[in-house]
């Protein structure tokens, strides 16, 4: 497994990519809600300011119809940084490598809802609301999971034509 593909996405055939993406979201659901909750508990003012800035940047890029993937990745990395836990930061460096593939598979049809979900997560973290941050992240990732399933259904329908 190459360092730039630690999750093994490129090792999969096209038909297995959807399953791999679902597995990726399952892992993110195990990890990121707790990252968000810990971030709400541990983030200081400067952490929250940076998270808010990144959240706004993602929103502006989406509103302008520009590529927002790099900013989205930085947002998720900042979430981990807000925990003040280096192991979580290291794990997030690996986890975010799957985000571009997810955007590709879902044809980026979720960008506007991502902005709203990120806003809710950011507000909860900034308010020190661990439960709100946790549930906001669960909502965000569950929405992502539904979009993968929708994309898979659409691909199967196209193949059956």
Describe every region a protein language model picked out.
Residues 1-30, 37, 154, 158:
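Short linear motifs at protein or domain termini
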Residues 146-161:
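Generic C-terminal helix-cap and adjacent flexible tail
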Residues 24-103, 115-118, 122, 132-142, ...:
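Conserved amphipathic alpha-helical segments that form helical-bundle/coiled-coil interaction surfaces
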Residues 108-116:
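Short, 15-30-residue, compositionally biased linear elements
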């Amino acid at each position: 497994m190459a360092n730039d593909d630690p999750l093994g996405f490129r090792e999969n055939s096209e038909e297995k990519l959807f399953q791999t993406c679902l597995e990726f979201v399952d892992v993110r659901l195990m990890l990121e809600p707790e990252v968000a909750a810990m971030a709400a508990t541990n983030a200081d003012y400067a952490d929250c300011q940076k998270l808010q800035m990144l959240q706004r940047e993602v929103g502006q890029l989406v509103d302008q119809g520009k590529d927002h993937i790099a900013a989205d990745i930085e947002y998720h990395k900042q979430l981990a940084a807000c925990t003040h836990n280096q192991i979580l930061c290291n794990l997030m460096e690996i986890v975010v490598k799957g985000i571009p593939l997810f955007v590709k598979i879902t044809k980026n049809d979720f960008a506007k809802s991502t902005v709203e979900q990120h806003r809710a997560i950011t507000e909860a973290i900034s308010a020190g609301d661990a439960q709100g941050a946790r549930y906001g992240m669960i909502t965000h990732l569950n929405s992502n999971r539904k979009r993968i399933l929708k994309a898979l259904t659409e691909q199967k329908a196209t193949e059956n034509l």
